[in-house]
């Protein structure tokens, strides 16, 4: 039997290397010059159970709330912004709207924290994706505390990883996106229908007639009874203010009915004049579960608010005429350093001055 010598083995090895190189070059040329891109697939959408953000391994952010496929060409991530959720229902609505508006203005992707999602998602059809906790823990965040009015500097923020803080709720941040904000804060259908059924079932207590104009009334009390006079040199809406506000509507609208909600319903029943037979105490006063009261207010035609973000958002979403409590602090109150009335209340809303005599 013929056995190859040493020089034959060397020749065979060299020829094998040459053929391997030629084969590799042909494959390489075919892959990268024939228009075929290599990419990594997104996760199976059927396994996405909650509105969390999905990042394709190519680095492209995908929206799980819409039908999608991963792009074949990688795109640079535009940045990740979020906001630290603080306060209760109305506060977090303001934080959500401000985050959405500022992120869009600066070309960034907005994410909300899981705790904010837990507060707002049971009530509204919100669409912003939820930030995964592990991303929140390890991201190289830079923080920015917002004051409660829009400033030019907020339109030119360069940080790609930005966590906003504070209690923004000024219309100056988001009013140019009003239709989008109203869409984000669309009630779930079962809440809207329940509120509509409640309103359609209301009758004037004396005559039994059906009202045609509904005025939502939100009376903020609770912790504000101590916070306003002791900390901010301010007052809350009193009996006289509510009487003036109701009379304003009675003078301009035929046979309105006033739908009262509050976190102090006992006070409302004892202090709001019901002698005309046009007041309904509809609120349940449950601060921990504001869904019913808020839905009722937003389905009304007009709004009377006292102070606070809950009343602001009820009025903003309801539309129509709005009466608010104006000048509710003394001129030297430190509250005016963080609160600008012209940035808090829409220009077309009507203010009625508060009675500050209890502070004198």
From Swiss-Prot:
Biological processes per GO annotation: carbohydrate metabolic process; fucosylation; lipid metabolic process; olfactory bulb development; positive regulation of cell-matrix adhesion; positive regulation of endothelial cell migration; positive regulation of endothelial cell-matrix adhesion via fibronectin; positive regulation of sprouting angiogenesis
Catalytic activity field: a ganglioside GM1 + GDP-beta-L-fucose = a ganglioside Fuc-GM1 + GDP + H(+); a beta-D-galactosyl-(1->4)-N-acetyl-beta-D-glucosaminyl derivative + GDP-beta-L-fucose = an alpha-L-Fuc-(1->2)-beta-D-Gal-(1->4)-beta-D-GlcNAc derivative + GDP + H(+); a ganglioside GA1 + GDP-beta-L-fucose = a ganglioside Fuc-GA1 + GDP + H(+); a beta-D-Gal-(1->3)-beta-D-GlcNAc-(1->3)-beta-D-Gal-(1->4)-beta-D-Glc-(1<->1')-Cer(d18:1(4E)) + GDP-beta-L-fucose = alpha-L-fucosyl-(1->2)- beta-D-galactosyl-(1->3)-N-acetyl-beta-D-glucosaminyl-(1->3)-beta-D-galactosyl-(1->4)-beta-D-glucosyl-(1<->1')-N-acylsphing-4-enine + GDP + H(+)
Pfam families linked to this entry: Glyco_transf_11
Membrane-traversing stretches: 9-27
UniProt subcellular location: Golgi apparatus, Golgi stack membrane
CDD domains, per the entry: Fut1_Fut2_like
Molecular-function annotations in GO: alpha-(1,2)-fucosyltransferase activity; galactoside 2-alpha-L-fucosyltransferase activity
Pathway note: Protein modification; protein glycosylation
InterPro entries: Glyco_trans_11 (IPR002516)
Enzyme class: transferase
Main location: Golgi
Annotated GO CC locations: Golgi cisterna membrane
Cytoplasmic side: 1-8
EC number(s) stated in the UniProt entry for this protein: 2.4.1.69, 2.4.1.344
Tissue expression pattern: Expressed in brain, intestine and kidney.
Lumenal face of the membrane: 28-360
Protein family: Belongs to the glycosyltransferase 11 family.
Purpose: Catalyzes the transfer of L-fucose, from a guanosine diphosphate-beta-L-fucose, to the terminal galactose residue of glycoconjugates through an alpha(1,2) linkage leading to H antigen synthesis that is an intermediate substrate in the synthesis of ABO blood group antigens. H antigen is essential for maturation of the glomerular layer of the main olfactory bulb, in cell migration and early cell-cell contacts during tumor associated angiogenesis. Preferentially fucosylates soluble lactose and to a lesser extent, fucosylates glycolipids gangliosides GA1 and GM1a.
Protein name: Galactoside alpha-(1,2)-fucosyltransferase 1
Natural source organism: Bos taurus
């Amino acid at each position: 039997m013929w056995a190859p010598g040493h020089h034959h083995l060397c020749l065979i090895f060299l020829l094998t290397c040459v053929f391997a190189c030629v084969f590799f070059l042909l494959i390489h040329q075919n892959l990268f010059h024939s228009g075929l891109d290599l990419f990594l697939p997104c996760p199976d959408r059927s396994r996405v159970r909650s509105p969390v953000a999905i990042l394709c391994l190519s680095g492209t952010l995908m929206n799980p709330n819409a039908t999608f496929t991963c792009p074949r060409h990688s795109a640079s991530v535009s940045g990740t912004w979020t906001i630290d959720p603080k306060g209760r229902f109305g506060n977090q609505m303001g934080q959500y709207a401000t985050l959405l508006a500022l992120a869009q203005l600066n070309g960034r992707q907005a994410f909300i924290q899981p705790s904010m999602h837990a507060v707002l998602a049971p009530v509204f059809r919100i669409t912003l994706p939820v930030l995964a906790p592990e991303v929140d823990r390890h991201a190289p965040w830079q923080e920015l505390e917002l004051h409660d009015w829009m400033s030019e500097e907020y339109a030119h923020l360069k940080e790609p990883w930005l966590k906003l803080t504070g209690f923004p709720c000024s219309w100056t941040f988001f009013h140019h996106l009003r239709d989008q904000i109203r869409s984000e804060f669309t009630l779930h259908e079962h809440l809207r229908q329940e509120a509509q059924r409640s309103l359609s079932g209301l009758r004037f207590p004396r005559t039994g007639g059906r009202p045609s104009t509904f005025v939502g009334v939100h009376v903020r009390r609770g912790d504000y009874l101590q916070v306003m006079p002791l900390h901010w040199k301010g007052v809350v809406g009193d009996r006289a203010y509510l009487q003036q506000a109701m009379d304003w509507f009675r003078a301009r609208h035929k046979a309105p009915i006033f739908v009262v909600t509050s976190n102090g319903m006992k006070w409302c029943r004892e202090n709001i004049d019901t002698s005309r037979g046009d007041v309904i105490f509809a609120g349940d006063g449950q601060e921990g579960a504001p869904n019913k009261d808020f839905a009722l207010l937003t389905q009304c035609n007009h709004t009377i608010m006292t102070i606070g973000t809950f009343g602001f958002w009820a009025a903003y979403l309801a539309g129509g005429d709005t009466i608010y409590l104006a000048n509710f602090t003394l001129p030297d109150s430190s509250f005016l350093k963080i609160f600008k009335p012209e940035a808090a209340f829409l220009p077309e809303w009507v203010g009625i001055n508060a009675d500050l005599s209890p502070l004198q």
